[in-house]
Amino acid sequence: MFIAGRVFSFWFIVIVMAAMFASIYRSTKLGKPPKLRPLAQVNAIDEAVGRATEMGRPIHFSPGFAPLINLDSAQTFAGLALLSYTAKLAAKFNAPLIVTINQPDVFPLAEEIVAEAYVQAGNREGLKADTVRYLSDQQFSYSAAVFGLIMRERPAANLLLGRWDAASLMIAECGA
């Protein structure tokens, strides 16, 4: 059952995890939730949305290349969670948002996330029909479409979150 030479590592991990869960359980019973530090990346999103609002220019957001049913779908769901956060900020500050999608199964989910964020922020009128755009499911065709969009719209913030391949460097350079 156990691999020779790994018994100590196994029991060490079990003891450390048990101690961690016990301390978290005890602290929540006392009414003190564990202290979590803020993520610098989320603070950067706040700054980027604020900068775009001040400049009066749009925010470009893309949740990456992975579809919803894939080994890499967790990265897409993380990108969509950050899309919700970014869309709420954009709706709150009335900053134009452009969301580009390259997977057909992600498109309706992204549309619903953005619409819900605008409704929650009380800015239903700020939502435009072309806020979420499906471009292409091919990596470099998508990149070319994003290049054109960046050149036309001149976004103040270019947020690429989720799973990315070779095109991410080109899009980031174009959007810089």
Language model features with spans:
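Hydrophobic core segments of alpha-helical transmembrane domains in multi-pass membrane transport
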Residues: I13-Y25
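Soluble extracytoplasmic domains of inner/organellar membrane proteins
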Residues: Y134-G175
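Gly/Ser/Thr-rich loops at beta-strand to alpha-helix junctions
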Residues: G64-I69, Q75-T76, L80, Q103-F107, ...
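Histidine-anchored nucleotide/phosphate-binding helix
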Residues: A48, A74-N94
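Short, strongly hydrophobic alpha-helical membrane anchors
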Residues: M1-G5
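Transmembrane-cytosolic junction motif
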Residues: A22-N43
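Long, charge-dense
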Residues: L89-A91, A95-S143
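Membrane-cytosol interface motif
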Residues: R37-E54, P58
